[in-house]
Amino acid sequence: MITDVQLAIFSNVLGVFLFLLVVAYHYINANTGKPSAKAK
């Protein structure tokens, strides 16, 4: 059975991974914008 400590570590690692995934998505999305969109 999974313990409270293992569950806490798993949820923290999952949370950090998802946060970094969102940050990476926004970074990539902001730096690969269309040139025509920047001209407006």
Curated annotation (Swiss-Prot):
Lumenal side: 1-4
Stretches of the chain found on the membrane's Cytoplasmic side: 26-40
Major site of localization recorded for this protein: endoplasmic reticulum
Disulfide bonds: none
Location(s) in or outside the cell: Endoplasmic reticulum membrane
Gene Ontology cellular component list: oligosaccharyltransferase complex
Pfam families: Ost4
Membrane topology: Single-pass type III membrane protein
TM helices/strands, residue ranges: 5-25
One biological process term in Gene Ontology: protein N-linked glycosylation via asparagine
InterPro entries per the UniProt record, alphabetical: Oligosaccaryltransferase, OST4, Ost4p_sf
Record keywords, A-Z: Endoplasmic reticulum, Membrane, Signal-anchor, Transmembrane, Transmembrane helix
Family from the record: Belongs to the OST4 family.
Assembly and binders: Component of the oligosaccharyltransferase (OST) complex.
Role noted for this protein: Subunit of the oligosaccharyl transferase (OST) complex that catalyzes the initial transfer of a defined glycan (Glc(3)Man(9)GlcNAc(2) in eukaryotes) from the lipid carrier dolichol-pyrophosphate to an asparagine residue within an Asn-X-Ser/Thr consensus motif in nascent polypeptide chains, the first step in protein N-glycosylation. N-glycosylation occurs cotranslationally and the complex associates with the Sec61 complex at the channel-forming translocon complex that mediates protein translocation across the endoplasmic reticulum (ER). All subunits are required for a maximal enzyme activity.
Protein known as: Dolichyl-diphosphooligosaccharide--protein glycosyltransferase subunit 4
Species in which this protein is naturally found: Drosophila erecta (Fruit fly)
